[in-house]
């Protein structure tokens, strides 16, 4: 089944140089002056110039139907920059733009369209640089050093708005109702869309649209907006503006997965790995006060301490949630890593996963059936695989051209150093023993006898995440593993990409002339003691998969150089991100959930206690998006994931799934 096929826009440029959609036979913007029309209709129609200086919240959220060339977004971004320059002390500090696009432009077509507006070039170039692959769902772009966030939702807007998480309800400050004309694209202009706009709009939110069609005005009025006609731009006689004056009360469709945030802006993060580091940055960007407590004497001493780690998405032959989450997480990770103003060893050399036997070949064939964009993953035959990786393989597979390897240890330490410059407080050699709720705060107790009090707490301490009374029932487990460090040779140095088989082998790091090969797997084992048997197994798995490859025999583990770590994993291979669930209250409240779904209350959680964990062996891929998701949730901001996929990350999911079926939770 072609699950992940997003059709790019097919367009041509008319005599005026304006892009025209072949699918809808309509222009993307006015032939006369598209830039001025955007300023008049959407910025003026929503009165943004007068609203920005008096906005009482640090974040202003705009939603749009039909991203197209991005003209509306770029024009708004330019205006927001001017506002920030003129009003540096204003309460409003950040802009969040949410847009939906069924047929996204290619990067090349986007760049051609942007040539129309040279004055927007400083902003257009940033957008082009981060333009995402045509994958369905939400693509979060962090622009202007995080001051501007763009959520691009690729897919049908009427389907996507039904899939949005409930935390987005009543958050939008202004709507840009754009898109091809109703007569050209009637499928978009529906009561379903108008009702979704009303559901997402906060009381007092505004909307503007270029059309004055009667059915649009009536539909928006029926949805709850107060509508008025205004003079249109240029030769257009009329346009529509509206205000949400009602206070709607949307219902929760799945309250057992509801994500609650915090009105507070102070937290303690427990941990010292890549998840803790990236979460610190994401919260600091939102104005939080953050204190990091780490049991070790420096960061990246746990699972994030390896010399080389592979970056590529996990794909599944049968799990839709994995296939929705990891490709998006991977592309977000690449954008974030590329934008970080820190240095760390890495090479985006590509990753190739080989089908060395019948079972692995079947698995890869099923992964390829997902019809992912070639920029993310594509098939290789044996000859193509050998050309890509640079060594003899005798088999084909699947390649991830944007993947590669990085040094997690360097990355983690560099990010924490960057966060410290931005206000992060760090406390090393602090081993947490217990958490005690005290009124509206959490008291932290450490092995030293020291205590600390914080308004909120995030547990991001790897395989030790279930060491506390509140988290002990979580269905997570430890996985011990050993990665071997091997010296390069002339034959091994030919390896150009990360090679994945029944293990993995990285290209050499030019700074130390070593490769990493691994990793052993010991479920339930928390030992970090070096094992000679694991060294042998790491080498033998390579030889077993490529028995005819002479280069593989040059892998030398006799130097006994290795690193042992412990990962935290779940049975369904997905992370756990969000509120820490109250296990006993969940079982009590949802004892009859299978028979009484309609009257169920929101999920029982520990107020102000959150978690980010169970990243397994793909933490480099999933940690950036997980950190962004949790920071958004904690801050009551839009979450860059659809409700179904977000539910698949909820720490209570394995219990709730059983309760929904009337099964016992053990």
Swiss-Prot record:
Q: Which InterPro entries match?
A: FAD-dep_OxRdtase (IPR006076), FAD/NAD-bd_sf (IPR036188), MnmC-like_methylTransf (IPR008471), SAM-dependent_MTases_sf (IPR029063), tRNA_MAMT_biosynth_bifunc_MnmC (IPR023032), tRNA_MNMC2 (IPR047785), tRNA_S-uridine_synth_MnmC_C (IPR017610)
Q: Where in the cell is it found?
A: Cytoplasm
**A GO cellular component annotation in the UniProt record:** cytoplasm
Record-level Gene Ontology MF annotations: flavin adenine dinucleotide binding; oxidoreductase activity, acting on the CH-NH group of donors; tRNA (5-methylaminomethyl-2-thiouridylate)(34)-methyltransferase activity
Cofactor dependence is on: FAD
Q: Segment FAD-dependent cmnm(5)s(2)U34 oxidoreductase: which positions?
A: 270-666
A Gene Ontology biological process noted in the UniProt record is: methylation
- What reaction(s) does this enzyme catalyze? 5-aminomethyl-2-thiouridine(34) in tRNA + S-adenosyl-L-methionine = 5-methylaminomethyl-2-thiouridine(34) in tRNA + S-adenosyl-L-homocysteine + H(+)
Write down the Pfam families for this protein, in alphabetical order: DAO, Methyltransf_30
E.C. designation(s): 2.1.1.61, 1.5.-.-
Q: Where is this region: tRNA (mnm(5)s(2)U34)-methyltransferase?
A: 1-245
- The lineage's top-level taxon is Bacteria
Q: Does the keyword Cytoplasm apply?
A: yes
Q: Keywords, A to Z?
A: Cytoplasm, FAD, Flavoprotein, Methyltransferase, Multifunctional enzyme, Oxidoreductase, S-adenosyl-L-methionine, Transferase, tRNA processing
Biological role: Catalyzes the last two steps in the biosynthesis of 5-methylaminomethyl-2-thiouridine (mnm(5)s(2)U) at the wobble position (U34) in tRNA. Catalyzes the FAD-dependent demodification of cmnm(5)s(2)U34 to nm(5)s(2)U34, followed by the transfer of a methyl group from S-adenosyl-L-methionine to nm(5)s(2)U34, to form mnm(5)s(2)U34.
| HAMAP family, A to Z | MnmC (MF_01102)
Q: Which family does it belong to?
A: In the N-terminal section; belongs to the methyltransferase superfamily. tRNA (mnm(5)s(2)U34)-methyltransferase family.
Q: What is this protein called?
A: tRNA 5-methylaminomethyl-2-thiouridine biosynthesis bifunctional protein MnmC
Q: What organism is this sequence from?
A: Salmonella typhi
